[in-house]
Amino acid sequence: NYAYLTMIDKVSSWKFAEDFATEPEHIKQARFRAEQLGVETITPATGAQLAFIVSAIGAKTAVEAGTGAGVSSLWLLEGSEKLILTTIDSEPEYQNVAKQTFQEAGLDSSRVRAMSGDAHRVMANMADAAYDLVFIDAEDQDIDDHLHSASRLLRPGGVVAFAHALFRDRVPDPAIRDEATANFRSAV
């Protein structure tokens, strides 16, 4: 049965990719804090991919919508020692944990600007065409708003990246038509 074997291959491939990525100790500590808070994080392989993108495009400035405990922030910053990150989260508790994470990771405070508030509202007050990368790890109902903001914030040639872009394998399935999946599908 081809479909069954394809699914096995997919699971094996994902496991291989996830097991292949190594995570620095400071990011492991951030992941532990996120688990304690009940905050979903990106996987180590996704983090490594984000760091690669930052490096590949030579990003100097980035915006992150959805700080959480700082796991994805740290991965973005792994991509370049020159990156300046503005990270936004609506949960002050998460921001406080992330700030502690950044401090314990030894990051210079000039590299990270952590802002509390609704990401869409905060991004509305940020400079146009001033960022090389926008990473969106936010609630699914906000994806369209964040994509619109990202397109305004990005310099020509800038990159927008989404956490969970395939929305837990729902986006490729045309039979799934709920609003959240449709939002991700249109964004991708």
Put a short name on every predicted segment.
Residues A62, V134-D137:
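Hydrophobic beta-strand segment of the Class I
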Residues Y2-A59, V63:
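Class I SAM-dependent transferase core
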Residues D142-V188:
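C-terminal substrate-binding/active-site "lid" region of AdoMet-derived donor-dependent transferases
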Residues I88, G117, I136-A138, G157, ...:
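Active-site flanking residues adjacent to catalytic metal/cofactor-binding acidic residues
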Residues G79-S80, G106, M126-A127, L153-L154, ...:
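A generic alpha-to-beta junction signature in SAM-dependent methyltransferases
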Residues N125-V134:
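A short acidic, Gly/Pro-enriched loop at the edge of an enzyme's catalytic core
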Residues E40-H120:
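SAM cofactor-binding core of SAM-dependent methyltransferases
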Residues G47, E139-D142:
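Short beta->alpha connector loops
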